[in-house]
Protein backbone atom coordinates (compact mmCIF):
# COMPACT_ATOMS: atom_id res chain seq x y z
CA UNK A 1 0.00 0.00 0.00
CA UNK A 2 1.28 3.45 -0.89
CA UNK A 3 2.20 5.94 1.81
CA UNK A 4 2.05 9.05 -0.36
CA UNK A 5 -1.32 10.79 -0.33
CA UNK A 6 -1.42 11.44 -4.08
CA UNK A 7 -0.64 7.79 -4.78
CA UNK A 8 -3.47 6.65 -2.53
CA UNK A 9 -5.77 8.89 -4.54
CA UNK A 10 -4.44 7.50 -7.84
CA UNK A 11 -5.11 3.97 -6.59
CA UNK A 12 -8.73 4.93 -5.83
CA UNK A 13 -9.12 6.63 -9.22
CA UNK A 14 -7.58 3.71 -11.08
CA UNK A 15 -9.92 1.25 -9.38
CA UNK A 16 -12.97 3.33 -10.35
CA UNK A 17 -11.73 3.59 -13.94
CA UNK A 18 -11.02 -0.15 -14.06
CA UNK A 19 -14.57 -0.97 -12.98
CA UNK A 20 -16.05 1.56 -15.41
CA UNK A 21 -13.95 0.19 -18.30
CA UNK A 22 -14.87 -3.37 -17.36
CA UNK A 23 -18.59 -2.51 -17.52
CA UNK A 24 -18.22 -0.85 -20.93
CA UNK A 25 -16.21 -3.77 -22.35
CA UNK A 26 -18.75 -6.24 -21.01
CA UNK A 27 -21.63 -4.41 -22.69
CA UNK A 28 -19.60 -4.29 -25.93
CA UNK A 29 -19.09 -8.05 -25.84
CA UNK A 30 -22.81 -8.55 -25.22
CA UNK A 31 -23.79 -6.30 -28.14
CA UNK A 32 -21.40 -8.03 -30.53
CA UNK A 33 -22.50 -11.48 -29.32
CA UNK A 34 -26.18 -10.61 -29.88
CA UNK A 35 -25.37 -9.48 -33.42
CA UNK A 36 -23.38 -12.65 -34.09
CA UNK A 37 -26.23 -14.84 -32.80
CA UNK A 38 -28.77 -13.04 -34.98
CA UNK A 39 -26.48 -13.38 -38.00
CA UNK A 40 -25.94 -17.10 -37.38
CA UNK A 41 -29.71 -17.56 -37.08
CA UNK A 42 -30.14 -15.85 -40.45
CA UNK A 43 -32.34 -13.05 -39.11
CA UNK A 44 -31.40 -10.14 -41.40
CA UNK A 45 -33.73 -7.48 -39.98
CA UNK A 46 -32.63 -8.08 -36.40
CA UNK A 47 -28.98 -8.29 -37.47
CA UNK A 48 -29.20 -4.86 -39.12
CA UNK A 49 -30.58 -3.29 -35.94
CA UNK A 50 -28.02 -5.04 -33.73
CA UNK A 51 -25.14 -4.12 -36.05
CA UNK A 52 -26.04 -0.43 -35.75
CA UNK A 53 -26.31 -0.72 -31.98
CA UNK A 54 -22.95 -2.48 -31.71
CA UNK A 55 -21.25 0.11 -33.93
CA UNK A 56 -22.73 2.89 -31.81
CA UNK A 57 -21.46 1.27 -28.62
CA UNK A 58 -18.01 0.82 -30.13
CA UNK A 59 -17.88 4.52 -31.03
CA UNK A 60 -18.93 5.47 -27.51
CA UNK A 61 -16.22 3.25 -26.04
CA UNK A 62 -13.64 5.02 -28.21
CA UNK A 63 -14.85 8.45 -27.11
CA UNK A 64 -14.60 7.36 -23.47
CA UNK A 65 -11.06 6.08 -24.04
CA UNK A 66 -11.90 2.48 -23.20
CA UNK A 67 -10.66 1.00 -26.48
CA UNK A 68 -8.42 2.31 -29.25
CA UNK A 69 -10.06 3.78 -32.34
CA UNK A 70 -8.34 1.26 -34.62
CA UNK A 71 -9.66 -1.66 -32.58
CA UNK A 72 -13.17 -0.22 -32.86
CA UNK A 73 -12.72 0.28 -36.60
CA UNK A 74 -11.59 -3.33 -37.04
CA UNK A 75 -14.53 -4.67 -35.04
CA UNK A 76 -17.04 -2.46 -36.90
CA UNK A 77 -15.55 -3.59 -40.20
CA UNK A 78 -15.85 -7.24 -39.22
CA UNK A 79 -19.50 -7.00 -38.20
CA UNK A 80 -20.34 -4.92 -41.29
CA UNK A 81 -18.66 -7.56 -43.46
CA UNK A 82 -20.62 -10.31 -41.71
CA UNK A 83 -23.88 -8.40 -42.21
CA UNK A 84 -23.09 -7.88 -45.90
CA UNK A 85 -22.42 -11.61 -46.35
CA UNK A 86 -25.72 -12.38 -44.64
CA UNK A 87 -27.62 -9.97 -46.88
CA UNK A 88 -25.99 -11.42 -50.00
CA UNK A 89 -26.89 -14.96 -48.98
CA UNK A 90 -30.51 -13.93 -48.34
CA UNK A 91 -30.75 -12.16 -51.70
CA UNK A 92 -29.42 -15.15 -53.62
Curated annotation (Swiss-Prot):
Amino acid composition bias (Basic residues), ranges on this chain: 1-11
Spans annotated as Disordered: 1-22
BP GO annotations: translation
Taxonomy, superkingdom: Bacteria
A GO cellular-component term linked to this record: cytosol
Family according to the record: Belongs to the bacterial ribosomal protein bS20 family.
Function (record text): Binds directly to 16S ribosomal RNA.
Identification of the protein by name: Small ribosomal subunit protein bS20
Naturally occurring in which organism (per UniProt): Thermobifida fusca (strain YX)
Amino acid sequence: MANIKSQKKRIRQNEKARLRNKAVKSSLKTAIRKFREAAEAGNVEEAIILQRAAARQLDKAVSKGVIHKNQAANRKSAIAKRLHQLQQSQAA
